[in-house]
C-alpha cells in the first residue's frame, strides 16, 4: 500500500442497484471510485481490504440502503455518521442528510418487530451490514471514513420476504430459493415489485445527496 493518500475518494456500496445512480453521476470524475463489495461483513472486509492495499484513498464512504430503527425517520431519509477528519459533515447537512447512529448487523432486519428489538437494544437510528468493518479497516490505515445511507424501509415496515432465508453462505441472493418462495407465495410478487420501485427511488435520493455533498452538481452534473 502506498504511504501517502492517492487523492481518490472510494465510495462503497453493497449492491449494484444501490450504486447505479451515483456511479452514473460520478463516471466522469477520475478521483471518485465506486466499489461494489457484496453484502455483509465478510464481503465488505475482503473487497475494501484489497482496495486499500492497491491504492490508499484520501477518503472512504460506506453507502447504500439501511433499515430504519428510529420510528421518527421515514423511508427516503438520508443519514450519515462521519469522522471529523473527512470534513464532510457541513456539506452533508447542507445536502439534506441527517446525522445518525448506525447499527451494523450480521443479518438483515426484515420485520418491524426485529427493528423494534434492535432499536431498544442499540439506540441506533438505522441498521445496515457493512459500515462497521469498513470503518475499522479505514481507521487501521488512518484513512478518514464516513457512512452515508438512505432508509429503504422505515421502522414500522415489514419487508415482503425474510431475505436471510434466501441467501447463500457467501451472502448472495439465491435465485432458486427466491423462485421457490414466490411459487409457494405468489401474492408476495406484487410486494416485491413495490420494494424494487422503492429501492430505485431510494438509490436516486442517496445519489442526489452524495452529488451535492461532493460537489458534483457544481461541476456540471
Predicted features by range, described:
Residues 1-4:
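Short boundary motifs at domain starts and secondary-structure transition points
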Residues 7, 20-221:
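Glycine-rich phosphate- or other oxyanion-binding loops that anchor nucleotides, phosphorylated ligands
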Amino acid at each position: 500500500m502506498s504511504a501517502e493518500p492517492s487523492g481518490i475518494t472510494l465510495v462503497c456500496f453493497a449492491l449494484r442497484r444501490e450504486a447505479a445512480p451515483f456511479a452514473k453521476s460520478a463516471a466522469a470524475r477520475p478521483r471518485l471510485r465506486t466499489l461494489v463489495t457484496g453484502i455483509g461483513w465478510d464481503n465488505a472486509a475482503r473487497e475494501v481490504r484489497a482496495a486499500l492495499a492497491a491504492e490508499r484513498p484520501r477518503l472512504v464512504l460506506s453507502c447504500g440502503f439501511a433499515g430504519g430503527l428510529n420510528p421518527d425517520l421515514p423511508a427516503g431519509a438520508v443519514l450519515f455518521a462521519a469522522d471529523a477528519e473527512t470534513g464532510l459533515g457541513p456539506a452533508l447537512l447542507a445536502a439534506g442528510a441527517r446525522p445518525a447512529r448506525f447499527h451494523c448487523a450480521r443479518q438483515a432486519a426484515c420485520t418491524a418487530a426485529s427493528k423494534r428489538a434492535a432499536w431498544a437494544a442499540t439506540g441506533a437510528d438505522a441498521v445496515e451490514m457493512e459500515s462497521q468493518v469498513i470503518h475499522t479497516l479505514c481507521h487501521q490505515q488512518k484513512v478518514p471514513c464516513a457512512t452515508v445511507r438512505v432508509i429503504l424501509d422505515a421502522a414500522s415496515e415489514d419487508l415482503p420476504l425474510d431475505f436471510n432465508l434466501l441467501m447463500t453462505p457467501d451472502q448472495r441472493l439465491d435465485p432458486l430459493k427466491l423462485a421457490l418462495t414466490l411459487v409457494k407465495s405468489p401474492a408476495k410478487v406484487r410486494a416485491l415489485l413495490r420494494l424494487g420501485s422503492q429501492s430505485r427511488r431510494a438509490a436516486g435520493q442517496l445519489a442526489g445527496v452524495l452529488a451535492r455533498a461532493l460537489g458534483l452538481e457544481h461541476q456540471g452534473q
